[in-house]
A protein has these predicted regions:
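Residues lining hydrophobic/aromatic ligand-binding pockets adjacent to catalytic sites
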Residues: 1-268
Length: 268
């Protein structure tokens, strides 16, 4: 068995007007942007699936345009997570997962379930949601990541539930939202959201060095000592884990360069 999992870094999406003149080659047709982007970074988080519904031909097209080894993380549709009673999300979840996501095949990465900042932790209702998460869709294995954005989740019980259902808690490097570094699944999902367009590589060189070091620790199956855990008494099994690190939101113009700079550090 490999001593480390695979580390992939990327950004959110591939269509963003400022990238037309900063990231993409001059005069590159928009129809070629995905092909180009997927050859500069090994993964992309797709935000469009949160707002819109797509059909199988779209996922087939995305799979065909990206190279072998590339992985898409998909943000789960908002109708699944933006509801008062999470335990009633089953129909919406089945509709989203059954829309054709499995057509991505081995290019399907984690499904990111993002919860509203107003959604507070209700143990019973949240467990009812976790029980709905399927292990497979049309024969393709699914990996689930949970991004919570309310401080009420900073409790041991949340980490215990995520661990019970083998879902990964998203680590958010964010100015306002909770940062929870407990390892609860067999992969790691981090969203880096405090970058700046004033930095050529989104984060400072020191910040990128620190995130590269943490990514290596995670990939080896360990846990960075400098990140907060809500249940520090419970250690995850030491085993290789794939790591997904995305540069999101703040510093978006420079996000692709942050992802590439991080991958360069990891290759050195």
């Amino acid at each position: 068995m490999s001593k480390s999992g695979t580390i992939r870094s990327g950004m959110g999406g591939w269509t963003f007007e400022p990238w037309d003149t900063s990231f993409y080659p001059d005069k590159l047709p928009k129809a070629k942007q995905l092909q180009y982007a997927s050859r500069q970074v090994p993964s992309i988080e797709v935000n469009g699936t949160y707002y819109s519904s797509f059909k199988e031909p779209t996922f087939v097209k995305w799979a065909s345009e990206a190279p072998d080894g590339f992985v898409y993380s998909l943000k789960g549709n908002r109708f699944v997570t933006n509801r008062r009673v999470l335990g009633e999300a089953g129909e919406s979840m089945l509709r989203f997962l059954g829309s054709g996501v499995a057509a991505l095949g081995d290019k399907l990465g984690p499904i990111l379930w993002q919860f509203a900042p107003t959604k507070k932790f209700d143990p019973d209702d949240f467990e009812a949601f976790l029980k709905l998460l399927p292990e497979k869709q049309d024969g393709v294995a699914l990996r689930h990541a949970l991004e919570v954005r309310n401080d009420s989740f900073i409790v041991q019980e949340f980490a215990a539930l995520a661990r019970k259902y083998k879902a990964a808690i998203v680590y958010a490097d964010h100015a306002k939202y909770p940062d929870i570094a407990d390892v609860t699944g067999d992969f790691i999902y981090a969203r880096l959201q405090t970058g700046s367009d004033d930095n050529p590589d989104c984060y400072t060189p020191k910040g990128l060095d620190e995130w590269a070091a943490r990514a290596r620790i995670w990939a080896e199956g360990k846990q960075p000592a400098d990140l907060r855990r809500v249940d520090p008494a419970t250690d995850a099994p030491v085993q290789p884990r794939d790591v997904f690190v995305y540069f999101i939101t703040e510093g978006k113009v420079r996000a692709p360069f942050g992802a590439m700079a991080l991958m360069k550090r990891l290759a050195d």
